[in-house]
Amino acid sequence: MRREWVAKRQGHANVSQMHYARQGIITEEMDYVAKRENLPAELIRDEVARGRMIIPANINHLNLEPMAIGIASKCKVNANIGASPNSSNLEEEVAKLNLAVKYGADTVMDLSTGGGNLDQIRTAIINASPVPIGTVPIYQALESVHGTIEKLTPDDFLHVIEKHAQQGVDYMTIHAGILIEYLPLVRNRITGIVSRGGGIIARWMLHHHKQNPLYTHFRDIIEIFKKYDVSFSLGDSLRPGCQHDASDEAQLSELKTLGQLTRKAWEHNVQVMVEGPGHVPMDQIEFNVRKQMEECSEAPFYVLGPLVTDIAPGYDHITSAIGAALAGWYGTAMLCYVTPKEHLGLPNAEDVRNGLIAYKIAAHAADIARHRPGARDRDDELSKARYNFDWNRQFELALDPDRAREYHDETLPADIYKTAEFCSMCGPKFCPMQTKVDADALTELEKFLAKQPTGTSV
């Protein structure tokens, strides 16, 4: 779809959506997004130009269907997939991608750390994906030195980053905000550093006693991203890994640096979103969202959860969806899903499904709460179908039609029950929705009530 769009930009030194938006140009991607979001194209251009919205769209990801991440657009959901040295392979990861897209993932991150040739896995995922693909290039950089963190050089990072950009990655997590002077701030934490990429950079700095190479070479990364229109997803290496550590000095110090890096990227017309926690008590979620907006000049916020309690391994898609709904309501632009396997193991296909549906619920609830245009239309349609006992229409409108049909058919599987005016909860005699009050009956009742003395009490 994008081949002709991209061809017109050949030879441009900067091909980012922000670059064109700031020239007053509405790109084909912006126009496509405007139609998807039911928003004016000029509004999309303006939001991208000011940095409050991004359209992750690498010029080499030609089968991409452009989408937007920003407070003016619908709240989005990211799904993480990826092979590990101990589990999964290329075929399984492509299957997870297809499943994630089926259940509504707006973007997908390939977090592969092993399980085969990482370049082949990544390329297969990009070629199969209509949604933006994100990566964490530091993982492959570490693989390139056979896992010996101390051997990593700035050139190792830059080489892998450029390779990912050439392959068509739309956004990359860059852990440039964790500075050497922030490491002592984790001393009093319960869980220390819980970001994989952040942990790699921390160990490198502790060994070499040098500043974060992703920070010192940030301008070099900007130059790569300009050439391919890769968006920054600035990693929160010092995000809290438990309730105790939330909103501490380490987290907020890094956040200030992420804001500085955001504005540095904007100086060169490169798109940015900023990653956030993590594990946060419910009463601190609004503060975290507002603080990010303040420090990062309203760049889109992209949070992992956050989990609102730490005592539910196996159910962290629920503990985190609670926090995600609140974060979305307060203005977070994209939610990174958490699966039931979080903290326990690599998610399988069913875990991906359960995590995604939990997060689609959270994002949709946030859209309704923020009164986004048309956000409640589907709810109203499903409610009408429910009131009219149109079971097939209810299944069709559900976030997970297969699950809705499966649960209904567990007890009433025959086709005749698809038109029945009850389900197995209430049975044929006790369903309150069978009480149809027509307009004539209400008119008669109103006439009767009008004749009654005022102030009548029982």
From Swiss-Prot:
It is an enzyme of class 4 (lyase). InterPro entries: ThiC (IPR037509), ThiC/Bza_core_dom (IPR038521), ThiC/BzaA/B (IPR002817). Keywords: 4Fe-4S, Iron, Iron-sulfur, Lyase, Metal-binding, S-adenosyl-L-methionine, Thiamine biosynthesis, Zinc. Binds 1 [4Fe-4S] cluster per subunit. The cluster is coordinated with 3 cysteines and an exchangeable S-adenosyl-L-methionine. Its cofactor is [4Fe-4S] cluster. Transmembrane segments: none annotated. This is Phosphomethylpyrimidine synthase. The lineage of its organism: Bacteria, Bacillati, Cyanobacteriota, Cyanophyceae, Gomontiellales. The gene is thiC.
